[in-house]
Regions:
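Conserved catalytic-core motifs of GNAT/GCN5-like acyltransferases
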Residues: 156-174, 326-338
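Acyl-donor binding region in acyl/amide transferases
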Residues: 89, 94-161, 259-326
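Compact beta-rich and alpha/beta scaffold cores in large eukaryotic transport/transcription complexes
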Residues: 11, 35-39, 125-142, 146-147, ...
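A cross-taxonomic marker for long C-terminal extensions/tails that follow the last structured domain
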Residues: 64, 77, 176-203, 207, ...
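Short amphipathic alpha-helix that is part of the acyltransferase structural core
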Residues: 13-63, 179-219
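A conserved beta-strand-loop-helix scaffold within acyl/acetyltransferase catalytic domains
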Residues: 41-103, 205-270
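Structured alpha-helical
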Residues: 1-26, 129, 297-298, 314-321
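C-terminal functional modules
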Residues: 328-372
Length: 372
């Protein structure tokens, strides 16, 4: 839809795309993978528990990042700002669907000016390129910075163009024994199921989720996978639906991609969708059937567990099935028509951060907690 007057004014004030790097004082993909991971360690983003999970696979993870860099800016771009004296800031953005991107791993060496630069440059690039349809960010609700920026996105953009959903993140062993139930029919997705999948996803996750995840247009992510194949990687999606009689009551959406694009392995998560009118007993039957099918998508997965994301109401059921609760996560999504508003929202937030930093009423490091 066309921008309103305020949004158009925001767009008109942006630099040309060719001038973006100089205008914001940023560089794109100029940092090496080793330097970037060193920055993650220095800023505490790779804290001990997270580093311990990555360490056994660090060589593979770094190689995956290098291949993503080899694709230019078609799969991954890392904005950096600042220098050794001022402190560096970085933001990574990777292509999660054919026309959607995930903002992640915002870090700063006590340089709020650099953090502002990389965030606004990323937002401006999305607007100026004009080819992207959605952006998203995953954050832990207890992390103050992302909770204040991304957690308030609906207030800034509106519920028709953005969403913020709370989820529980689990690890479930790939070898877990799951009960089967003849009363629940689980089927692999094909095009004939698209209406059921989109309807269920809209009821459980919202219309913004359906749009951003491109469920109506490319469930297996075929177009995206072609881009990843160019650098010897894969990005696919596998779906199963659960039916009670003829009605869809659940779905498992298994994302597969290069290990470690996200340090919580969200690029390889399994999203579990359960109809809201199910009893706890029915939830367990449906979840068991879906997970029993979805585990086959992880036959070649490097980890011994599957990253599992579900609504918080499913926690008792999944614990009963052998899943281990890891943490709470929020997924913030904003759509293309909301980009100018999200840009103003981030700009306004950082104006306050910088004002406080200048006055030294609080330390910038307290305001710039990394998105973990």
């Amino acid at each position: 839809m066309p921008f309103d007057g305020v949004d158009q004014e925001t767009v008109n004030r942006l630099p040309r795309l060719s001038e973006l790097h100089d205008a914001y004082g940023v560089q794109v993909n100029s940092i090496s993978v080793d330097e970037l991971f060193d920055l993650y360690e220095r800023t505490g983003f790779l804290y001990p528990d997270k580093a311990a999970r990555l360490l056994p696979h660090l060589g593979r993870v770094k190689e995956n990042w290098r291949r993503m860099f080899d694709a230019g800016e078609s799969l991954l771009y890392v904005f950096t700002a600042g220098d050794q004296r001022e402190g560096r800031a970085a933001l990574a953005v990777f292509r999660t669907t054919h026309r959607g991107w995930t903002y992640q791993h915002l870090v700063s060496e006590d340089n709020p000016f650099g953090s502002r630069s990389v965030m606004l440059a990323a937002g401006a690039a999305m607007i100026l390129k004009g080819s992207d349809e959605s952006a998203q960010n995953w954050f832990r609700p207890e992390n103050r910075f992302p909770a204040r920026v991304f957690g308030s996105m609906i207030e800034a953009i509106g519920g028709s163009l953005s969403s913020v959903q709370n989820y529980a993140y689990f690890s479930i062993p790939r070898t877990v024994a799951l009960p089967s139930d003849q009363g629940i029919r689980v089927v692999p997705y094909d095009a004939a199921h698209n209406k059921d999948l989109c309807s269920l996803a809209e009821l459980t996750r919202g219309r913004v989720f359906v749009t951003a995840e491109e469920l109506a247009t490319d469930v297996p992510l075929k177009s995206l996978d072609l881009l990843y194949r160019r650098v010897g990687l894969r990005r696919t999606r596998h779906v199963w639906l659960a039916y009670r009689q003829k009605w869809p009551v659940g779905a498992a959406i298994a994302y597969r991609g290069p290990l470690g694009l996200n340090f919580s392995f969200l690029e390889n998560r399994c999203d579990l969708l359960l109809a809201s009118d199910l009893t706890e007993t029915e939830q367990q039957r449906v979840a068991a059937g879906l997970l029993g099918a979805a585990v086959t998508a992880y036959d070649t997965f490097e980890l011994d567990f599957i990253p599992l994301v579900a609504g918080e109401s499913a926690m008792p059921v999944l614990l009963n099935l052998g899943a281990q609760f890891v943490r709470h996560y929020c997924q913030c999504i904003w759509l293309k028509d909301g980009y100018p508003r999200s840009y103003r929202h981030v700009d306004s937030f950082y104006s306050k951060v910088l004002d406080r930093a200048r006055k030294k009423t609080v330390q910038p490091s307290a305001l710039l907690e990394s998105v973990r």
